Curated annotation (Swiss-Prot):
Listed name of the protein: Inner membrane protein E199L
Keywords: Activation of host autophagy by virus, Disulfide bond, Glycoprotein, Host membrane, Host-virus interaction, Late protein, Membrane, Transmembrane, Transmembrane helix, Virion
GO cellular component: host cell membrane; membrane; virion membrane
Entry keyword Disulfide bond: yes
Assigned protein family: Belongs to the asfivirus E199L family.
Locations listed in the record: Virion membrane; Host membrane
Inducing stimuli: Expressed in the late phase of the viral replicative cycle.
Signal peptide (residue range): none
Disulphide linkage map: none
Residues modified by glycosylation: N131
Topological category with respect to the lipid bilayer: Single-pass membrane protein
Length: 199
């Protein structure tokens, strides 16, 4: 059974890994190196080479970059786009056939999972869609909601909007406090932004 992805955008939030994808016997025949990497992952013996063999949508290489596998159970850890998937995302940490990278293995073996995420072992609902999912992820775990902010600096357009908003707020504050002194008045925002374009 092929699992066609809804999106192939790097780090797009995806939670439905219910499609098991090609069977294990089919995976063994078609992708023996990938299956061997998954087996090593079962015993925490995966290597950096295994990480490359499995790959991801973001890597644009390896098993998990291929349409038929990208959103299968095997790729639930590397392609979910969720924070701390190895700690708190059931299709990843609750599935032995989901390949965990060497980094994810180290987080688990060194017990570096944030303690507040343990309540999310069984995710009842997952929030975030479209552009909003680029900003936050909601884990709704048995009526307890944890929101994790993603680094806005990874999104240049959102960063630009944030900078413009900050400049407008600063301008408003300065112009309202210095409004009584005509000599201290700031230029209008349109002039400020037109000067920014000259840089």
């Amino acid at each position: 059974m092929s699992c066609m992805p809804v999106s192939t955008k790097c780090n797009d939030i995806w939670v439905d890994f219910s499609c098991t994808g090609p069977s294990i016997s089919e995976l063994q025949k078609k992708e023996p190196k990938a299956w061997a990497a998954i087996l090593r992952s079962h015993t925490n013996q995966q290597t950096a080479e295994d990480d490359t063999i499995i790959g991801s949508i973001c890597d644009k290489q390896g098993l998990c970059s291929k349409d038929e596998y990208a959103y299968s159970q095997y790729c639930a850890c590397v392609n979910s786009g969720t924070l701390w998937a190895e700690c708190a995302f059931a299709p990843c940490n609750g599935n032995k056939n989901a390949y965990k990278t060497t980094e994810q293995r180290n987080i688990l073996t060194n017990k570096q999972c944030p303690s507040g995420l343990t309540i999310c072992q069984n995710i009842a609902e997952y929030g975030g869609s479209g552009n909003i999912s680029d900003l936050y992820q909601n884990f709704n775990c048995n009526s307890v909601i944890n929101t994790f902010l993603i680094n806005v600096m990874n999104h240049p357009f959102l960063t630009l909007i944030l900078i413009i908003l900050i400049l407008i707020i600063i301008y408003r504050l300065m112009s309202s406090s210095g409004g009584k002194h005509n000599d201290d008045k700031l230029p209008p925002p349109s002039l400020i932004f037109s000067n920014l374009n000259n840089f």
